[in-house]
Amino acid sequence: MYKLLPILLFAYGLALTTEDIYDNSWALIIGIDKYENVSNLDYAVKDANSIASLLKDNFNFPSKNVTVLLNEEATFTNIRNGLSKVSSSAKANDRVLIYFAGHGETMDLPDGGEMGYLLPIEAKRDELFTTSIPMDDLKRISSMSQSKHMLFLIDACYGGLAATGARGLSSSTPNYIDKITKDKARQIITAGGRGEQVVEKSEWGHSAFTMNLIKALENNKGDLNNDGYITAEELGLFLKEKVTIDSDNMQTPISRRYTSDEGEFVFINKVENIIINEATINIVDTINTINYMSVKLL
């Protein structure tokens, strides 16, 4: 037993890394809190900068692959160009993350449906069709990209997601990690639905959604089954619970898929993994010392 335990612990410490799953990582980060034609927000730019830093520092997103558009940079044209560039740059074994912090809006359609929009800095609520980014565009971009995994994190509330509610594989599925990291994934998590409000507080210095997104990723709190991986599905469940509570039920995050693929966008926190690996090595060293002393006593 003593000889097997170090092997098991060491194997656990050498879990899959980001490089084992993805060849490259790409991100488009958008934050707008100073609008030209609609009300301002307080922390969208700070939220966007925090997420960009977290991706680069903890999750192996190369700085050259992370595009950040803030306030006056986040125009209708620049956002569309950014979406096109990041999605087309990714290759077949890459991942793409798109984060937006700003206003969302919902338009009623003549057929009784609804369309959600992301509002660029110059957006006009009475001219959404010509001044804003429809959610259908996100779905189209996700289908055009070669990337293996794509995740949209939208810190805005609106309806008309144009996505399905399908759930992914259960973590109890045999070879779960192997399956979710090889199959394609097109996933989206939004801060809330139509008629809800993005909650920001000075005591947080963030919105409720991004504050909890940071907690989920930075401290591995989004790793609900403690297997060392944070999947987009786990992230959605974590955000739904925490944001609903912190916002006093003013917003409830929504998680959806654009396709029926069963893959999962995966986050592996390299900083947390270093801590785990160092702890594992210390435990192995301790057990080996005990084994050595036991042999000497015999």
Describe each region flagged by the PLM:
Residues 2-3, 295:
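N-terminal leader/targeting segments
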Residues 13-298:
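Cysteine endopeptidase catalytic domains of the caspase/legumain-like
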Residues 3-12:
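Sec-dependent N-terminal signal peptides
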